[in-house]
UniProtKB/Swiss-Prot annotation:
The keyword Flavoprotein does not apply. Pathway: Amino-acid biosynthesis; D-alanine biosynthesis; D-alanine from L-alanine: step 1/1. One of its GO terms (biological process) is D-alanine biosynthetic process. Substrate binds at residues 130, 305. GO terms for molecular function: alanine racemase activity; pyridoxal phosphate binding. The modification N6-(pyridoxal phosphate)lysine is found at residue 35. This is Alanine racemase.
Amino acid sequence: MSRPIRAFINCAALRHNLAVVRRHVHQARIMAVVKADAYGHGLLRVARALDAVDGFAVLELEAAIQLREAGFSQLILLLEGFFSIEEIEAINHYRLSTVIHCHEQLSMLLAHKKTGKPDIFLKINTGMNRLGFRPEEGNSVLNRLRQWHTDISITLMTHFACADDLLEADHVDQQLGSFARLEEKREGCIPRTLANSAAILRYPGTHADWVRPGIILYGASPLPDKTGIELGLQPVMTLTSRIIAVQHLDFSDRLGYGGQFVADQPMRVGVVAAGYADGYPRHAPTGTPVLVNGRRTRLIGRVSMDMLTVDLSGINEAGAGSLVTLWGEGLPVEEVARSAQTISYELLAALSPRVQTVSSIP
């Protein structure tokens, strides 16, 4: 029998969360961000549940090809673009869309033979300072692309650095201003994509032609002051395991690596088959919430590679075989992330391949 840790993926929740996005964006087209194996939820499983979207965004060419070969006909965008001439050929062959964010990519594309109708998302750096051309370069790059290929589709794209933070609204306005100045100088109407998950929720004026929801599709909040549940979302991943042993600590007994937890009274401890090699955060401290048989308790001691330990005080019926919920249904992943001083994105995307995923809920 295999280890009892499981990640249950609720595909109905995915569709519910997509409906929430649609209510926010009205007429904008939706490009579901399914990078990092759909944030740890399984690329094809998620894409099939979200097959009503207008497009998908991925990172690797291999993931884009996997989607296309699985029969998805929607737009499929490579968020970091291409890295070689050979990849441009594959993009053409599989009818993929690509970001262009730097002069090196532009030079590779312009040196490539003209085939088909290229679909380019031109990334503009409006203030995140990660990827993209400077706004003052935008029209020059647009003109070079149009001179290279008269039958080319171009969408302008940018990414917000601080849309999740209400105290940084001025920074969002500055980025919008940079984008608007580029638009004032160009000729004709070009589609735009600006809004990530946080902007979808907080800045309706950024929705434009395409929105790019990521974390909200998986039921977690992009906003630091709210959980997904508070936003009307449903958790898609519920990570569970089982207690595999029970230990009895006496007063002053120490627990686990480093002996950092010291019992201040006699207590029962559940040893759970889940550790940092499964994707649970090693730095989660004592006090991080967990559920045992649906009842709230706490992580105690240091998380090890394959196991962690939980406080069974007051849960007298718990023992070997009892169900432990690490996050998901009944325990928001944002709460666990906050305790571990990280973000829900990291916890979901870090799920280990050794954890079996099941398209259901426990």
